[in-house]
From Swiss-Prot:
Function: Component of the eukaryotic translation initiation factor 3 (eIF-3) complex, which is involved in protein synthesis of a specialized repertoire of mRNAs and, together with other initiation factors, stimulates binding of mRNA and methionyl-tRNAi to the 40S ribosome. The eIF-3 complex specifically targets and initiates translation of a subset of mRNAs involved in cell proliferation (Potential). Component of the COP9 signalosome complex (CSN), a complex involved in various cellular and developmental processes.
Single GO MF annotation: translation initiation factor activity
Family label: Belongs to the eIF-3 subunit M family.
Localization per record: Cytoplasm
UniProt name for this protein: COP9/Signalosome and eIF3 complex-shared subunit 1
Gene name for this UniProt entry: cif-1
InterPro entries documented for this protein: COPS7/eIF3m, eIF3m, PCI_dom
Lineage: superkingdom: Eukaryota
A Gene Ontology term for the protein's cellular component: cytoplasm
A family per Pfam: PCI
Oligomeric and partner information: Component of the eukaryotic translation initiation factor 3 (eIF-3) complex. Within the eIF-3 complex, interacts directly with eif-3.F. Component of the CSN complex, composed of csn-1, csn-2, csn-3, csn-4, csn-5, csn-6 and csn-7. Within the CSN complex, interacts directly with csn-1 and csn-4.
Biological source species: Caenorhabditis elegans
Domain PCI: 188-351
Coiled-coil features, chain-numbered ranges: none
């Protein structure tokens, strides 16, 4: 039996009477033909009732009351018999039947009920894992994935608790990824997909083609991502060199290419952006221009606006200034425009690649920072000693 302390109570009558009333209510719909009493065994009785819940949203004005009543009965089914009941419930209380966005929708009501059930089965890991999968899918329909605790650390803790096999982890990660994309949380979705690819090794990397393609696609179209070289190190992405050379070439383009390279690629593959990356080309044009600006910033910290306009294929007027402001706002670079000299002064920038050279540079800068802090500390100490000596 589930932990009923984790769930609210929805009815104050005995179980047999509640089952009979549910059957009577559900039989109001023409397509439902339940026996008025049903099987004497509660689990079988509940399975029959749950099998009719797919039509509930199409006619009932009391979806929340019915689902809450049923969930209060599910949790009293003995542990060894509850799994098929839960299976029937989540099969019929699914996104294809419970539609809408937000808490007030049918999907939102289902999210609430599934959340309560999830909490009630903390001691039944197999059942809880099934409910969680259903909950993620329903959150995607209701656009409520932001309300579900599903960051990577939490997911890994759950996988460890449930002892979820690798393929099961991949299935859940894919579902979370889809839900995040639906809710336009592209940056989080990209991280989840990268974690998914991390479950593949060189032995099964070839089987990860679809996941690898989606990982590259999600990362490239994410407006907040500017560094992609870490994807190259994933076995599943490496396998794209042979399984999907064009997608791998696109990844390399966004790792180190420029606007010129991008235009040449699109000219040779005119349908790739819309059919494979599935994104409006204006989004990618802005992205590759930002990446090109970052590459220019790596080469020199003072760039003439005329050169910048030429490299980015933007008129050297207010349009260019607006682009630079956008680049600063998304943290691609930091700097300012010198109107008199007509130059862009770059004070810092994001690295497109972060390899050995960048780590060495970071180490040098940290050493300088530490040395400066030590010197400052010594100076303050000397000043304090002089004050005390007065």
């Amino acid at each position: 039996m589930a932990d009923t302390r984790e769930l609210p109570v929805f009815a104050y009558i005995d179980d047999v009477k509640q089952l009979q009333e549910l059957r009577q209510y559900l039989n109001k719909h023409d397509s439902v033909k339940l026996d008025p009493n049903g099987p004497s065994e509660t689990a079988q009785n509940m399975i029959e009732i749950c099998s009719t819940l797919n039509v509930l949203p199409s006619w009932s004005q009391d979806v929340d009351l019915v689902l809450n009543s049923i969930s209060s009965l599910i949790v009293v089914v003995p542990g060894e018999k509850c799994e098929p009941v839960v299976d029937s419930f989540i099969k019929n209380v699914a996104p294809q039947f419970y539609k809408g966005t937000g808490w007030a929708s049918h999907a939102g009501i289902a999210v609430r009920v599934l959340s309560n059930l999830y909490k009630g089965y903390s001691n039944f890991h197999t059942v809880q894992e099934k409910i969680f999968k259903a909950l993620v899918d329903m959150c995607a329909e209701a656009r409520l994935i932001g309300e579900l605790e599903c960051n990577l650390e939490t997911l890994q803790d759950r996988f460890n608790t449930w002892k979820t096999p690798v393929e099961g982890q991949r299935e859940i990660l894919r579902a979370v990824h889809r839900a995040l994309l639906v809710d336009q949380r592209v940056d989080q979705a990209a991280k989840v997909m990268t974690a998914l690819l991390g479950t593949y090794t060189e032995k099964d990397a070839a089987a990860a083609r679809d996941d690898a393609m989606e990982c590259v696609r999600t990362a490239v179209v994410d407006p907040k991502s500017f560094s992609f070289d870490h994807l190259e190190r994933l076995s599943a992405v490496k396998a794209l060199k042979t399984s999907d050379p064009l997608m791998f070439t696109a990844l390399e383009l966004f790792i180190s290419g420029t606007l010129k390279d991008y235009k040449e690629f699109v000219a040779k593959n005119p349908k790739f952006v819309t059919e494979h990356l599935k994104v409006d080309e204006t989004i990618l044009l802005k992205k590759i221009r930002l990446l090109t600006l970052m590459s220019l910033a790596e080469e020199k910290n003072e760039i003439s606006l005329d050169e910048l306009a030429k490299q980015l294929d933007i008129l050297a007027d207010e349009t260019l200034e607006e682009f630079v402001i956008d680049a600063i706002q998304v943290n691609a670079i930091s700097g300012k425009i010198n109107e008199m000299a007509r130059t862009l002064i770059v004070s810092s920038y994001q690295h497109r690649r972060f390899g050995t050279e960048q780590w060495v540079l970071l180490e040098k800068r940290l050493k300088v920072l530490i040395a400066n802090l030590k010197q400052t500390h010594n100076n303050v100490h000397e000043v304090n000693q002089r004050i005390e000596a007065l």
